[in-house]
Regions:
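Charge-dense, intrinsically disordered terminal/linker segments
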Residues: 1-6, 109, 134-136
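Disorder-to-helix initiation segments
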Residues: 1-10, 16, 76-83, 87
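Conserved alpha-helical segments that form or flank metal/cofactor-binding pockets of metalloenzymes
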Residues: 31-64
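Long amphipathic alpha-helical segments
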Residues: 56-60, 124-136
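Acidic/histidine-rich alpha-helical segments that form the ligand environment
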Residues: 69-122
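Helix-loop segments that flank and shape redox-cofactor active sites
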Residues: 15-38, 97-105
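A structural signal for well-ordered alpha-helices, especially hydrophobic packing surfaces
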Residues: 6, 17-24, 47, 51-54, ...
Length: 136
């Protein structure tokens, strides 16, 4: 897998994290505010650890190898549960590719832990009508 493909996904995760702040600023509910912050922290912490571990294996990228931020797009949504689902699904391709490389088993475990945390967040979003999203 190319560094540029990996960096695309990592930086899209940061965009999803920022999108949670957009939801945070537009909601009145205390539960929704707390969930937005929790989800944002989950995504940011994961993206950082994913980058550190992945680039530890592939080698430190040059600045020019990284994705140009103005070229990135995500499917925006104002539904926090749906945002969790999208931010979780985006790493599926990494898991599939990294699962083929024995030395990246730690990254596969990291991805699995993240996906589990996001599933929990989606469930917690169902309380107090923070999200109407129904998982597939």
């Amino acid at each position: 897998m190319e560094i540029s493909q990996i960096s695309d996904i990592i930086f899209k995760l940061y965009l999803y994290a920022d999108a949670t702040k957009m939801i945070h600023y537009t909601t009145d509910g205390n539960h929704a505010h707390k969930m937005c912050d929790k989800i944002r922290n989950t995504i940011v912490d994961f993206a950082d650890e994913l980058a550190e571990q992945t680039f530890g294996y592939y080698g430190k990228p040059s600045y020019t190898q990284l994705t140009k931020l103005n070229k990135l797009e995500i499917n925006e949504t104002d539904d926090l549960g749906e945002l969790c689902a999208r931010a979780s699904e985006i790493v599926d391709i990494l898991r599939t590719e990294f699962n083929k490389i024995d030395k990246l088993s730690g990254v596969v475990s990291l991805i699995d832990d993240y996906k589990g945390a996001m599933q929990k967040n989606m469930f917690l979003c169902s309380f107090d009508k923070v999200s109407n999203y129904k998982q597939k």
